[in-house]
């Protein structure tokens, strides 16, 4: 298992354009850059949508459970998103 050899993080990767951020929630090596290579996209976050919009945070809970069982640790922000569901 290739991904067991290093520390994994479930974190936000910034996309979009200047002053219009859009984030993908990804599983990546903890030493890779914020917007660098990642193993899998497990959700998305659009901070420009209203707080009650259901599309503001989209998560694939099954895949997040899988990656946490393998040893991936969510960042503080991603942990808040998961706790809200």
Curated annotation (Swiss-Prot):
GO terms for cellular component: cytoplasm; small ribosomal subunit. One of its GO terms (molecular function) is structural constituent of ribosome. InterPro entries: Ribosomal_bS16, Ribosomal_bS16_CS, Ribosomal_bS16_dom_sf. Keywords: Ribonucleoprotein, Ribosomal protein. GO terms for biological process: translation. PANTHER family: 30S RIBOSOMAL PROTEIN S16, SMALL RIBOSOMAL SUBUNIT PROTEIN BS16M. NCBIfam families: S16. Belongs to the bacterial ribosomal protein bS16 family. HAMAP family: Ribosomal_bS16. This is Small ribosomal subunit protein bS16. It comes from Neorickettsia sennetsu (strain ATCC VR-367 / Miyayama). The lineage of its organism: Bacteria, Pseudomonadati, Pseudomonadota, Alphaproteobacteria, Rickettsiales. The gene is rpsP.
């Amino acid at each position: 298992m290739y991904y067991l050899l290093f520390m994994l993080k479930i974190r936000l990767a910034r996309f979009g354009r200047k002053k219009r951020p859009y984030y993908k929630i990804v599983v990546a090596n903890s030493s890779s850059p914020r917007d660098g290579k990642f193993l899998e996209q497990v959700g998305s976050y659009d901070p420009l949508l209203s707080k009650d919009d259901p599309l503001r945070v989209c998560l694939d809970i099954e895949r997040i459970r899988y990656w946490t069982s393998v040893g991936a640790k969510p960042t503080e922000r991603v942990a808040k998103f998961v706790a809200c569901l």
